[in-house]
Amino acid sequence: MAVITKIEVQKRSKERFNIYIDKGQGEEYGFSVNEVILIKHGLQKGLEIDEIALGNILYNEEVQKAYLQAISYLSYQMRTKLEIEDFLRKKEVGQAIISEVVSKLLHDRYINDKEYAILYTRTQSNVNRKGPTVIKRELLNKGVQDLIITHSLQEYPKEKQIENALILIEKKKKSYQKHSFLQMKLKLDEMLVRKGYSRDVIQICLEELKDEKDDEKQQEALHYHGNKYYEKYKKYDGWTFENKMKQALYRKGFSIDEIEIFLQMKREEG
């Protein structure tokens, strides 16, 4: 049995208190607690506490400490239940305490995976223009349940997906101006897959791109690559030269007809 002999406010934190006790051998430092724990257990000078009571006080102090760590972590941005659990594990908090902290955070509505998923979907679709497949994978990695994700993705209709995909295409296609139209389409297709768009949405967007095909730019790309390969293969004669040129340009996405026209032009120049 111990008796509390003195309670003093810590100099560096007005919300924490040092508790001094006497176990029969004079006053000594016992432990420190948060103000919440001080009030919860009614700690005051003269109070007698046994080992069981002390154990409960110290356990609740650890819970409060972990709770405040979680609150601080949440102050930067919203987090999922799993993210909070992982954060506390890295702080070497025990599982029993983690469970209590998460339960309290859920009760106080500091964490709510449904609200998090909706906000995350809106942000990733509107700001980063990610497709639903990537958003779903990222939410799963954050521990959000599949049913909650399905509900949150209703915030991201197909029309918005198409709008975002077309914006991404418009930005990216400028960097493919020296590619053939076919090769540009393939690269844009790959980009949209990486971004998380469905095959259906990609097909619709690339069909719209077909209507914008620029013959002049296609010819510029053909001449750019054709002249590069011409310099590379001009040391060859006849069939070998033409075969290497055709294979190289075909791999770049140009049609046989386009390649033949280019080679005919080179024959006439020569």
Curated annotation (Swiss-Prot):
Its main location: cytoplasm. It is found in: Cytoplasm. It comes from the Bacteria. One of its GO terms (cellular component) is cytoplasm. The keyword Nucleotide-binding does not apply. One of its GO terms (biological process) is regulation of DNA repair. InterPro entries: RecX_HTH_1st (IPR053926), RecX_HTH_2nd (IPR053924), RecX_HTH_3rd (IPR053925), Regulatory_RecX (IPR003783), WH-like_DNA-bd_sf (IPR036388). Keywords: Cytoplasm. NCBIfam families: PRK14135.1. Belongs to the RecX family. Modulates RecA activity. This is Regulatory protein RecX.
